[in-house]
Each structure stands twice: as structure tokens, then as C-alpha cells.
């Protein structure tokens, strides 16, 4: 994934902490916005958790520990303070954030809203936040054999923007226990990594990234240092109102690692070195439009992006347990009370509507893409990172590297749109230029709400209200999900509501399964493996 940009000219005074490592400033108290989310069980009961979110360290004011002097201004480090990575970390501090006024981040109950352009004392573009379990640690999700559900409103995201919700294999504490130079930790949003091995991060592994720093040629606020931060990435949702994709990006290591120079690979390295790193920067992606299903997602289409909807992602294992091997990543939607199956590929050589090893191999072959996915472990490697636990990222960004054309237009732009895999959406190849998007769509925003996590089939039939963004429960409150009538646009049968039958796309069998073994009208209990059958 490409990096995110922020326009911030800090004009603050501070009283600063002093010590011998990357520090925390004290001018602005860090207060994390609250965000509720739910954990569900197989019987349909969901418990509300009182969580909070934190903005990434790259967005924060970085200043001297002995004065209000910026350590980083525009897209350059102050070399009188930052003579090298270690010294810079000792001399500089990260300060607290004013989330709404500076970054356009607001929460209400279970809803998080991210504004695109925020003009306060300085100009901010986009944001990247993490869900926390407490004030000093990120929440870790172990996705294997589970289901992750959320509501999203992308109606105000035009071409060139990406409202991305995804998981990365960051350290739960942001790196404080492993790297003594990191005194800020998860409380201040440190420790980011992804499959692009981003080199635009200001701090990595408790050190600054000022050595070899080259200011960006097309962005006055960013640059690239000698080091990158690598880890596995599961893009559950990358989308605007035109296109969407979900993508698995495995890495050789299940934990975060630091890389050097162009050997990092990914977006931030020379074009010839894109695949030289330890991660898969391309991943195995599922974009319905790219797979020929051009009438499935968008304004007024099957999944109508003019209105909020629910996104359900299932991480299915070979034995149906949380300790099994990842074999499939499946997508469902719920909108206006209807369960909608994912838009299937229209290419005869690429079958299905989910990510499997067979799908990834056939898609790479059809599109002529290099199969770096298998080189770095494929689905099994992705599953190993999930088993360790991954951090939830919620973000909104524009793309200075490729104008987001890889998501919503024809890409590469010098290839024919009729070539399989080139067309990814209806946006013009001239769209997505950050300066234009920022000028023409400053009021764009995305909302995420009603996050739920639990066993497969436990979250999306529990009466979530798309876009409601409200929760009256505390962390000790348990609610019992009620059965609702679910329909699908992929069949002429509307189904029926029944307490004795599994709902559309729900689990209906498998070893150890004690729930219903028949499906509502119009659906058949379909064998997936010995531990899991589903109403399809």
C-alpha cells in the first residue's frame, strides 16, 4: 500500500520531556478518541468493547526536546538536530494530537469519521489510525477461522481516494519492549509497517529515518529514508465510491522487520527493485471490476455506493478452527436487509468469488502478473501472520505514487483497457492526481462503524444498522442477536426467517457444529471442508 500524506506546519510551543531516546512532548496531552466495537460468539451474542483509536506517529509534530524547534519541516530534517538516526531519536519528541481540529478525526459510539482535508492552524491531508485495547497497546486480532464485519459509507469518496481498512503485523506495544530507543510507543502511534516496506516513515525501530533522507520530488511534505518497515498486510477493504478490492500480502517473516535501501522493494524503491524485498507488494487481490464484473459495485449498482452497507470478510481454514491453515478469504455484503454474495469473476479461466490458492494462481496467469504471492508464502504465509495477531488500521489517503489508478481506473495506463486485468474501474486515467483531488474534493470523507468480530456466521446477521454509528452499551454489556430476514440478489428466492434453519451464507455443518444443519429457502448447505459447511 502507498503511504499517506500530511500537510502540517507546526507552530506550537511546548514543555518537553528529556531523556536519551525518542521522546514524548508534553505541550498537548494525548487523549485517544473512544470507539466501541463488538466481539460475537457462535450463538449470536455480541459483547460491546470500549476501545479507542490513535493517529500514526508520522502525522505528529516532531520537535526538539530542548526547544520548540521543529526536527522536521516540510519534507526535510533539521540536520543541526538530526545528524544521524540515533542522535535524532534522542534529540526529538513526538507530541500529542488534537484529533478533530488538526486531523479531521471524530468518533461517536461505534462510528469513526475521517475527513480528507482539514484546515486548522495548518493543512492536513488524510489520516491513518489504529484501534487500541488500552491506552498503551494496540488491539490484536487473530483472524483465522473468524469473521470481521463493519459498516462503511463511501458515498463521499470520489476517484483518486482510498478509504482503507486493513490489518498489519505491527507490535502490540508499538515497539517499546523490543527497541529501547522507542519511548513513545503505541500511545503515540509508533511501529507502523506494511507489505510495501514503507521508507517514508520518520521513525523505525526506535530510531529516526533521517540517514540518506531524500525529499520527495512531487510532495512538499514527504521523503524517503535509508530504511523501511516491513510486515504482512491483509487489506480487508480498499475502496472509494467507484471501485473496491481486498488483497492478501504475505511476507517472509510473521513479525515486523527493518530493511535497507532499494532492497526493501515495494513502492518506495527503484522500479527494477519492486520485488527484491521480503514481502509481496502486489498481493493476491480481488477487485470485481478487474475480474470483469463491471455492474456489481458502484453508484446505483448491486452494492450501491450511494448508501452505507455492511462488509463481511471470512477467514476460512482447512479444519474450521482458529489453529488451522488459511485456505480461503470470502466476502459478503449486507445492504437494506439483503445479504449479497460477492461479485464473481466473469473469466472462465478464473473461477469463484473468493481468494483461494487456485484463484490466485489462475488470476496471476490470466493477467500476466508475476506470482510474487507464492514466493512469499501465499495464503499459508498470510495465515501465519494472522495466527500471531494483527493490528487494525483505519485510514483515508490519496496516492502520490500512482494516482490510485491501480484501484479505480485503467492500469498500467500504457496498456489496452481490453487486456484482462488492466481495467479496474470507470475513473479516467487522468484522475487521481493528488493536487487536483485535494483542491476539488476537500470535503470528502469516509465513515467506518459497527465493527464486529467473531466466529464465521456470528456477526452480520446480528441486526447491525448500517451507518448508525451509535452504541449504548458498555464493555460489560452483552446483547443477543436476533434473527432477521436476509435476501440476496444472486437468487430469485427471497429466503425466509427461521430460527431452525441457518441464514443465507451462515454455517450449517462441520465437525463439532451444534447449530442448524438446514438452510433457509433458496439456499443449500454446501460442504467446504470437514469442519465447515455453508448455506450458499
Swiss-Prot record:
Domain of life from the UniProt record: Eukaryota
GO molecular-function terms, A-Z: cellulose 1,4-beta-cellobiosidase activity; cellulose binding
Keyword DNA damage in record: no
Known catalytic reactions: Hydrolysis of (1->4)-beta-D-glucosidic linkages in cellulose and cellotetraose, releasing cellobiose from the non-reducing ends of the chains
Active site (record annotation): 233, 238
Signal peptide boundaries: 1-21
Domain CBM1: 500-536
The EC number(s) this enzyme carries: 3.2.1.91
GO BP: cellulose catabolic process
SMART domains noted in UniProt: fCBD
Glycosylation sites recorded in the entry for this protein: 351, 414
Role description: The biological conversion of cellulose to glucose generally requires three types of hydrolytic enzymes: (1) Endoglucanases which cut internal beta-1,4-glucosidic bonds; (2) Exocellobiohydrolases that cut the disaccharide cellobiose from the non-reducing end of the cellulose polymer chain; (3) Beta-1,4-glucosidases which hydrolyze the cellobiose and other short cello-oligosaccharides to glucose.
Name the UniProt record assigns to this protein: Probable 1,4-beta-D-glucan cellobiohydrolase B
